[in-house]
């Protein structure tokens, strides 16, 4: 398991104990979990059984065993819709720009059926003159600035060898301050049909499946680049790939995207309710509270992840 240090639990304003039975498996640390509630921190237990940690929490969600990933995907769907699309959180968006690969560009690979799939990252070496990057351009990822220019922001792996003092992730390129673009929605040249694998329809003796196509085609804003080789390729941002994978409607005529939480499409709360057994309004509530607290406190929401969710295949992918 990989969780915030127990002494840091007291700094949190919202804690989810996900598959971690703190009083039983972390007895010496359990007092931090109970004491933090005295300052108003809300605690949530996510575990199929009413374990010891559930009695220490304000609310208990009981997904069917092995369905934690479905619950997590639905919570992510709610958070992305509420805090990235409906009412964008400056704190969340700035965090994504500074500390994640979400602004980076990904090449789309063509399929025989006319659709595409995500390929590898775009590198500075793919572009004419390598964006002026002479040191390790094959290892430097690329993004668009808000001015619509291609840049190689500081901090990717290519900056960590041969260039002193460029280890930190920064919104800088060629020595200049720059703000990175997360989505290509306003810069797009065309809308690409991109395939994503779907595993929620696989039959399982322990919980219900929700049959859909094994490959879900989503429509993403894409930009066409001419590479140094002369080849013309479509690229998308990691951010747009994430939003599409979570099934969020971007107004691009995407029939597999959901515009409402009540639609039974991957990965809405209504979809997750059928698989996990957790009422969708509880999924919406906990996801919103967790993210809203993080938004207002600049990150004081924590998840204590227990080994219990790893006892099923792929549960460590939450």
Q: Over which residues does each language-model region extend?
A:
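Anionic-ligand anchoring segments at beta-strand to alpha-helix junctions in alpha/beta enzyme folds, i.e.
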Residues: 1-11
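Long, well-ordered, tryptophan-enriched scaffold segments
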Residues: 54-55, 59-296
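Acidic catalytic cores of enzymes that act on phosphate-bearing nucleotides/polynucleotides
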Residues: 282-285, 291-318
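A short helix->loop->beta-strand "cap" motif at the edges of active sites that frequently abuts
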Residues: 35-43
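Short acidic, glycine-rich surface-loop motifs adjacent to enzyme active sites
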Residues: 11-23
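Glycine/threonine-rich flexible loop motifs
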Residues: 22-33
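Short, polar loop motifs at secondary-structure junctions
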Residues: 46-52
């Amino acid at each position: 398991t990989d969780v915030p240090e127990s002494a840091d639990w007291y700094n949190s304003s919202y804690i989810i104990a996900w598959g971690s039975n703190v009083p039983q498996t972390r007895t010496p640390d359990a007092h931090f979990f109970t004491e933090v509630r005295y300052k108003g921190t809300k605690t949530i237990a996510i575990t199929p059984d009413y374990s010891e940690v559930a009695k220490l929490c304000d609310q208990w969600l009981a997904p069917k065993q092995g369905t934690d990933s479905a619950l997590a995907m639905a919570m992510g769907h709610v958070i992305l819709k509420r805090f990235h699309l409906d009412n964008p959180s400056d704190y969340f968006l700035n965090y994504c720009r500074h500390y994640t690969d979400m602004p980076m560009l990904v090449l789309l690979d063509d399929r025989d059926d006319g659709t595409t799939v995500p390929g590898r990252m775009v590198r500075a070496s793919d572009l004419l003159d390598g964006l002026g990057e002479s040191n390790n351009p094959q290892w430097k990822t690329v993004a668009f600035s808000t001015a619509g220019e291609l840049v190689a922001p500081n901090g990717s792996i290519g900056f960590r060898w041969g260039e002193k003092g460029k280890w930190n992730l920064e919104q800088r390129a060629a020595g200049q301050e720059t703000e990175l673009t997360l989505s290509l929605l306003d810069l797009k040249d065309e809308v690409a049909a991109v395939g994503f694998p779907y595993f929620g329809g696989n039959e399982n003796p322990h919980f219900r499946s929700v049959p859909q196509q094994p490959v879900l085609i989503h429509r993403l804003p894409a930009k066409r680049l001419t590479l140094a080789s002369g080849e013309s390729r479509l690229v998308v941002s990691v951010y747009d790939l994430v939003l599409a994978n979570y099934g969020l409607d971007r107004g691009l005529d995407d029939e597999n995207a959901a515009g409402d939480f009540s639609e039974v499409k991957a990965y809405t709360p209504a979809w997750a309710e059928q698989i996990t057994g957790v009422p969708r309004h509880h999924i919406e509530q906990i996801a919103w509270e967790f993210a809203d607290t993080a938004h207002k406190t600049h990150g004081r929401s924590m998840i204590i992840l227990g080994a219990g969710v790893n006892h099923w295949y792929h549960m460590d992918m939450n």
